[in-house]
Each structure stands twice: as C-alpha cells, then as structure tokens.
Amino acid sequence: MKYFLTVIIVSIFLLQCQTKKEDGQSGQYQVAGSIERLDPSISKIIPKDASLEILASGFSWSEGPLWIPELKALVFSDIPENSVYKWTESDSIQLYLKPSGYTGDTEKEKREPGSNGLILDKENRLILCQHGDRQIGRMKSELNNPLPKYEVVVENYNGLRFNSPNDIVMNSMGEFFFTDPPYGLDEWNIKELDFQGVYKITTGGEVILLIDSLSRPNGIGLSPDEKTLYVAVSDPKGAKYYSYTMDEEGRIVNGKMILDVTNMISKDRKGVPDGLAVHSSGNLFATGPGGVLVISPDGKHLGTILTGQATANCTFNEDESALYITADMHLMRLQL
C-alpha cells in the first residue's frame, strides 16, 4: 500500500510539472510576466514582441539550468528534491537524476541537499555543484543514459571541506570557476572554512582561491573574451554584482562593484542576485530583484525580465535564440 501511494504521489507531481505534450508541440504555453525596458539598447537583444513562457511548473526550487545541444534538452536542478529534471519540446519534463547532490545513506532530512549549478566539461561530461555532498562532482555515465553515480572533481581547499558549491562556469581551456556560499549547510558548526570563497580549478585539478571577501558569492560568469569574471552576491543586506579583471593565468588583478540592487528588493520585486549568464554581446542576464536584470558590462541596468517570482538562474541555448529561466516553482523561456 505504501509503495502504491508513493507511485500515485510521484505521478501526480510529474503531471503537475508538465506542460501538456500537445501544447509543447504547437509552441503554445502559458504567458507570464513582462519586459521592463529602461534603455533602448535592450531591444537589440530582446525583441519588442518577446513574451515569457511557462514551460513547466510544480517544482520546489528550480536552479542551475543547462542546455545540452546533444540532447536538444534543458536539464536543471530541483535542490530540495535532490533531483535533476530534463525538459524537451517534445516530451516536456522527465526525471533525469536522483539523487543529484546528496548521496549519503543517512535518513536525516537535509535543508538543501540537491545539486545546484550544472555545466558540461571539455569532454562533454556533466559536472554538478553538489550541495549535499559539499563537492564538485562528475556524472560517470553518458548524457543520454544518466545514472546517479558520481566521481569527485574537488571537495576541499587545503584539506578543509567546501561549504556547499553553488554555481560554476568554464573557460575555453577547460578551467572551472565556482562559488562556495554556505546555503547547503544544515548546521553552522559543521562549516570548516571561515570564509565564503570563489575558486578556480586548473586543468591539472589544482584548487586556487581567488576571492574570500564576499559575504554570499553566488552566480558566476565570464566575459566573452574571458578577461573578466562576474560574481553576484546574494546577501539581502548587500545585494550586488561585481566584476574582476583577470590576468593571462586567470588570477584576479582587480575588482569592483558594478551594480548595487539592495534598495530594489521589495514585496513586488522578489529575489536577490543569484545565477547569471553572459550574452555574446557582453551584457549580463543576471537574476535579482523582480526577475532577470539585463546589465551592461560596466554596470548599467538596461531592463528587467519581470517573472513575478523569486528567480534563481538562467542560461542560453547554443545559438542564443532562447533564454531559459528557473524561477521558484517554474521553468520559463524567453525566445530572443
């Protein structure tokens, strides 16, 4: 009876998550939100007739979207559910990985156990920021045959365990940059590092600390020329975006705050700076109060994709014809 009820519950959940298959085939989805245009230049990137579509709903907290060209699919994390889901135009939502972040056998319920940021490495393998296991992990199986078996990429800095790796980006050399705030920790006393870091992983597997001065480093991205690293700080008392100039070896030369949105946070504009994606134009699509802020490289706020939800992250497909957005319970898309 318990198994039967579990099957029913899971089936209902997946049905709630799905937009009807026939709707996906016709391209007709529920439209939500709006586009706030503060500078005319935003219309060069976001068409004037663009609308925000809800592709699927019913998630606990959607995060870490990643477009996989090989599968013509988007995968994304649901952190509280310790799962990764896959969305395609033809089949809508399917469970892709579970567990995705915490792989232990303890029955203790973890606050944020799942994976967060996702990325493909140079060998086209799935890399996961794993909150629950406090590591950067790599899925052992092929993308078209996913199995929840992982190997450790990195799990500590100078012998001290990471807090809970959050978001990740890769440069053309195959080096990773990632953030490590404390959101995945259930108890503060298990924290081993006395700071929240931004790190680089070299192709040889060396972990280099780049930044240790930010209260809540979260979203991360690289400029198209890979000379600038962008970091979003999800501290409601200091909700800011930073840019850092890097030398040829990928080390920080100098940094500055480019936009402070602390005063934008309100009941009408939910959310703090979280994940971000950098467009080929150099502009940032950075989640924050109200939805996804479009920000120029020098920090000018060009406009906002207003989602109506606290918004966690976003990513482009391979030709930047669509922006996929994870916003609380929703998976959304803006066609560009």
What positions do the PLM features span?
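C-terminal motif of bacterial Sec signal peptides marking the signal peptidase cleavage site
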Residues: L14-Q16
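Sequence-structural signature of mature extracellular/luminal beta-sheet repeat domains
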Residues: Q18-L336
